[in-house]
Amino acid sequence: MQHPREENSIVVELEPSLATFIKQGFNNLVKWPLLNIGIVLSNTSTAVNEEWLTAVEHIPTMKIFYKHIHKILTREMGFLVYLKRSQSERDNYITLYDFDYYIIDKDTNSVTMVDKPTELKETLLHVFQEYRLKSSQTIELIAFSSGTVINEDIVSKLTFLDVEVFNREYNNVKTIIDPDFVSRSPFIVISPMGKLTFFVEVYSWFDFKSCFKDIIDFLEGALIANIHNHMIKVGDCDETVSSYNPESGMLFVNDLMTMNIVNFFGCNSRLESYHRFDMTKVDVELFIKALSDACKKILSASNRL
């Protein structure tokens, strides 16, 4: 029988500066939102609100919203989770299967429930204290993915809860919710000496290869866009930005993209340092082709899992 979760690694050998470029791009651009906009609506459990919200914030939601990876990474979509659970004599614990999961279309604020895998029943979140008929413990909470704008329109779509209670509790906590986009990388990625390695988790209930392709396609597109938008100052080097003086042939490297690209074409640069280098050796389109070829190689390696 296939195990519901397996740890694997995807490894490709690349030119070292290109491998570093992809690793750094992944860590900086592939951001999966956390559920940091949390509101407890009712809580008679022994765990305080902050404990519930911390536990929920880090639920591994990518394995639930796997059909929407690309639009979540581009922030066209967000998501929310909702839990309303009362302790009973027979059921004295909460698993991830007890939550309801919804995708949010940010253009329309539509809220759509998604199917949840039965395997989530195996992931324990909380155990109630001993059951007592006259003091049964309950918890009701909702948490939105980071970056979700809470307004009247989206609240009106939350037909599964008491809107008056939601508005009251949200107003109590909204000033302490981090307004910045809070996220994590889906995988750990390293690139020692050009050995680009993705440490991944594969689950039995969805096609990981398709999801991984969505992530790599997003990464490739974002990196190419950043390359096209990147500028190196031409003229006197002032040590505030990457700059090149064609008269002296001196290059000052002040950002990771410049460092990785010029190193790909033979420079041995480091951040915040000067190097004598002929910038006419740099062919941006050639670098982009190498990047695209590397992404194809990564996907080919993932297909062997």
From Swiss-Prot:
Q: Does the keyword Transferase apply?
A: yes
Per UniProt, the keywords (alphabetical) are: DNA-directed RNA polymerase, Nucleotidyltransferase, Transcription, Transferase, Virion
Q: Which reaction does it catalyse?
A: RNA(n) + a ribonucleoside 5'-triphosphate = RNA(n+1) + diphosphate
Q: Which InterPro entries match?
A: DNA-dir_RNA_pol_35kDa_poxviral (IPR005059)
Does Glycoprotein appear among the keywords?
A: no
- Its quaternary structure? The DNA-dependent RNA polymerase used for intermediate and late genes expression consists of eight subunits 147 kDa, 133 kDa, 35 kDa, 30 kDa, 22 kDa, 19 kDa, 18 kDa and 7 kDa totalling more than 500 kDa in mass. The same holoenzyme, with the addition of the transcription-specificity factor RAP94, is used for early gene expression.
Q: Return the protein name.
A: DNA-directed RNA polymerase 35 kDa subunit
Source organism (scientific name): Rabbitpox virus (strain Utrecht)
Gene from which this protein is expressed: RPO35
